[in-house]
A protein has these predicted regions:
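N-terminal, positively charged regions that mediate nucleic acid binding
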Residues: 1-40, 419, 425-428
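Glycine-rich, mobile lid/loop segments that gate access to catalytic sites or pores
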Residues: 6, 66, 73-254, 380, ...
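Conserved phosphate/anionic-ligand binding catalytic regions in large, soluble enzymes, centered on
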Residues: 8-10, 14-19, 115-130, 253-278, ...
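Alpha-helical support elements that line or immediately flank enzyme active sites
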Residues: 12-31, 126-150, 287-311
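A short glycine-rich, hydrophobically flanked beta-strand micro-motif that places a catalytic Asp/Glu
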Residues: 39-41, 166-172, 242-246, 312-323
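Short, charge-patterned binding micro-sites
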Residues: 40-58, 324-328
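Internal helix-turn-beta structural module
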Residues: 46, 313-315, 322-428
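C-terminal catalytic subdomain
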Residues: 268, 273-317, 328-335
């Protein structure tokens, strides 16, 4: 019997994602000016207000007000009617120095003995369901909102009423063998201007007219654009039987941090695999790579993706766990969901993984180049499944004599640079 599976995504203007992006922008500023910075930065955003808190150990001085306002402007909160606007919002900082107790437990004279920044378990997942080895429902949910943001920023005349806050959700029907049959449901909720006024008509009639226009544009503009981005096998899943729920609660004018308070780290499933695989519970944004919540989750994704790409299995979950202050992981666990292509148990695969990939925190940092300012781009539309690329980033501040220019590689954990090593190790 067929079954349904659903994943959601949220836009860069969603309150929790605004908070994530501010936290990661601050992290990037610290790392650009001091690669050894230890950062744990949390952000709260609400009506007209940004609150920053956390612990930092760094030689750099960062203008946190300026960084926060630049992020808010970049997202698109630039109008006073939003009641959360880049120039006028208050920015309060309660960032203070990192605990000496924690720092002593993490830093070592031998960098490869560097202990994990905290205890916990982290997961990586990959599937051959899509070209980027991500679950299809989540990939589609991200794509819908990426395209919606591109329209809002680059082609505003097409859907001129769009505001920054939005959410998506995609449900896919699968057969008994886990093969996608068709897209069952698409949900889009997008914040919008009040672009039809109740002049000569009732407010209810005006609201209904706005909703009909948005639904029409989603079906005839947004979805066809997203469909065209995918290969033929995925395009075939878009049929006339898709159920659409567009702004199902009706008018969505009040949104963003004015509509809902946002906090760093509240969209961890959107950030990872959309409910597929597993999650250890630790958020990513605002944390430097000494925090294994982040770095080990990236490393586990890197392992899972390279294993699936090498043909070890069609679907893989990798778990790694740490104790604070201890470099060597407590365990490496692998689950192939019965879809392994090698004559080995999952335990034997896990043992082999430990031989191929050094999972000590310092080794992860160096292998994936995580001491660079690469994190702002991860803070919206998913940390996983993205395209590795080299970009030039420029950091300006009134507190430094000249701009800091960095050529950095984004999403290094998505590289398929270990496929040959994996194939050799598994005899593939």
């Amino acid at each position: 019997m067929s079954y349904l599976f659903t994943s959601e995504s949220v836009s860069e203007g969603h309150p929790d994602k605004v908070a994530d992006q501010i936290s990661d922008a601050l992290l990037d500023e610290f790392l650009a000016n001091d690669k050894d910075s230890k950062v744990a930065c949390e952000t709260l955003v609400t009506t007209g207000q940004v609150v920053l808190a956390g612990e930092v150990k760094s030689k750099a001085y960062v203008d946190v007000q300026d960084v926060a306002r630049n992020v808010i402007k970049k997202i698109g909160y630039t109008k006073s009617e939003y009641q959360f606007e880049a120039k006028s919002c208050g920015v309060f900082s309660a960032i203070h120095e990192q605990s000496g107790d924690i720092n002593r437990g993490v830093e070592r004279e031998d960098p490869y003995s560097q202990g994990a920044g905290d205890q916990g378990m982290m997961f990586g997942y990959a599937t051959n369901e899509t070209a980027n080895y991500m679950p299809l429902a989540l990939d589609l949910a991200h794509s819908l909102l990426l395209e919606l943001a591109a329209i809002r920023k680059n082609e505003p005349k097409i859907m001129p009423y769009l505001r920054p806050d939005a959410k998506s959700q995609v449900t896919i029907e699968y057969d008994d063998n886990g093969k996608p049959l068709h897209i069952h449901t698409i949900v889009i909720s997008t914040q919008h201007d009040e672009f039809i006024e109740a002049k000569g008509i009732s407010q209810e009639e005006a609201d209904n007219a706005m909703q009909k226009r948005i639904e029409y544009d989603v079906k005839t503009i947004l979805v066809p654009r997203v469909k065209a981005q995918y290969p033929e096998n995925v395009q075939a899943l878009f049929d006339d039987n898709i159920i659409y729920h567009v702004n199902p609660t009706g008018k969505f004018v009040i949104g963003g941090p004015h509509g809902d308070t946002g906090l760093t780290g509240r969209k961890i499933i959107v950030d990872t695999y959309g409910g597929k695989g597993a999650h250890g519970g630790g958020a990513f944004s605002g944390k430097d790579p000494s925090k294994v919540d982040r770095s080990a989750a990236y490393a586990a994704r890197h392992i899972a993706k390279n294993l699936v790409a090498a043909g070890v299995a069609d679907e893989i979950l990798v778990q790694v766990a740490y104790a604070i202050g201890v470099a060597k992981p407590m365990n490496i666990f692998v689950n192939t969901y019965g879809r392994s292509n090698v004559n080995m148990t999952d335990g034997e695969i896990a043992q082999k993984v430990g031989e191929i990939f050094d999972m000590r925190p310092k080794a992860i940092e160096e292998r994936l180049k995580l001491r660079n300012p690469i994190y702002f781009e991860t803070a919206s539309y998913g940390h996983m499944g993205r395209q590795p690329q080299v970009v030039r980033k420029v950091f300006n501040s009134r507190y430094i004599p000249k701009p800091v220019v960095c050529d950095v590689e984004l999403f290094t954990w998505e590289k398929l640079d270990y496929v040959d090593k994996v194939k050799a190790a598994f005899g593939l």
